[in-house]
């Protein structure tokens, strides 16, 4: 139960109007050595920068997001739209002249785009919000360029060349709000986002995670047990990048019930630059974990079966 309690306490700690310490009347206990080990591992596990995570999500997302525009009544309006990222990770769009958000942008370019992770299910999953100006493209060369960018992301969007569809792009980026899940959030300066590169492994993250979850979940559980000393009931990889992977796990609690899923970061011993590198890294980590845990089990067995030494008197 500690994992769920600790996870939510991280979120609560940011709310100044809630009681802190023992003020809420609930008893507090010191974490066990195992819990301390897991906490320390999580603090030190290698992670992408917020800018890299946000850029990767925009770049390798499914190309859909929620655009928010200023309506004629000066209220925010939202719509689910298709987008395509350019080389800077800024979104381009193709909108019908009849759409409400098209009319909004023609009058006021201030807007934002919110993109969630492809498998978004709730507050523990990642989302990014780009805020800036979205303007219609009028230059013929730019128009050709951004139509090609859009078609590359959405090959079936043949209507992008229709006369009643206009091409827009985000021309200025004011700020980026990124939330990677519980207790992982940041406002990213535009310069950091523009300079960051999308992580090359995240392009294949869904395929890697799907394969591991379907065929090799025992290997993931083995790696976590070796790295953190935590035996999992289930371990579902949610994301993979060159530095490691994010895993949703459940554990058996003292009352023998299974916990709610919670997120763990599992770092790689070294960077995996591509899909093949990740595969090799996971094989290596699985073999190392199996060998180490086998050796530990043999040591424990030897300690319990070795008879105590007896002293003899002369």
Regions found by a protein language model. Name each.
Residues 8-314:
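Binding-site signature for planar aromatic cofactors or substrates
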Residues 1-4:
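N-terminal chloroplast transit peptides
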């Amino acid at each position: 139960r500690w994992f769920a309690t600790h996870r939510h306490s991280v979120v609560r700690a940011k709310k100044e109007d809630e009681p802190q310490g023992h003020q809420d009347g609930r008893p507090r206990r010191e974490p066990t050595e195992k819990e301390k080990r897991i906490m320390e591992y999580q603090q030190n596990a290698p992670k992408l920068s917020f800018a890299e995570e946000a850029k990767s999500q925009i770049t390798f997302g499914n190309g859909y997001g929620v655009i928010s525009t200023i309506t004629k009544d000066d209220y925010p309006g939202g719509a689910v739209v298709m987008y395509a990222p350019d080389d800077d990770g800024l979104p381009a769009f193709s909108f019908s002249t009849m759409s409400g958000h098209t009319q909004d942008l023609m009058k006021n370019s201030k807007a934002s785009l919110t993109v969630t992770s492809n498998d978004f299910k709730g507050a523990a999953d990642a989302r990014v919000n780009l805020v800036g100006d979205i303007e219609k493209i009028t230059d013929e060369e730019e128009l050709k360029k951004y139509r090609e960018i859009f078609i590359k992301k959405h090959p079936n969007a043949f209507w992008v060349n229709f006369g009643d569809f206009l091409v827009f792009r985000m021309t200025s980026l004011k700020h980026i709000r990124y939330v990677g899940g519980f207790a992982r959030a940041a406002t990213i300066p535009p310069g950091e986002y523009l300079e960051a590169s999308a992580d090359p492994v995240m392009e294949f993250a869904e395929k890697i995670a799907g394969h591991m979850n379907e065929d090799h979940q025992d290997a993931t559980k083995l790696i976590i047990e070796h790295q953190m000393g935590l035996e999992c009931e289930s371990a579902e990889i949610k994301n993979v990048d060159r530095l490691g992977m994010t895993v949703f796990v459940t554990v058996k609690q003292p009352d023998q019930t299974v916990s709610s899923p919670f997120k763990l970061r599992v770092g790689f011993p070294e960077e995996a630059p591509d899909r093949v590198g990740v595969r090799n890294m996971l094989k290596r980590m699985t073999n190392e974990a199996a060998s180490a845990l086998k050796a530990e089990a043999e040591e424990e067995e030897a300690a319990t079966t070795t008879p105590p030494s007896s002293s003899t008197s002369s």
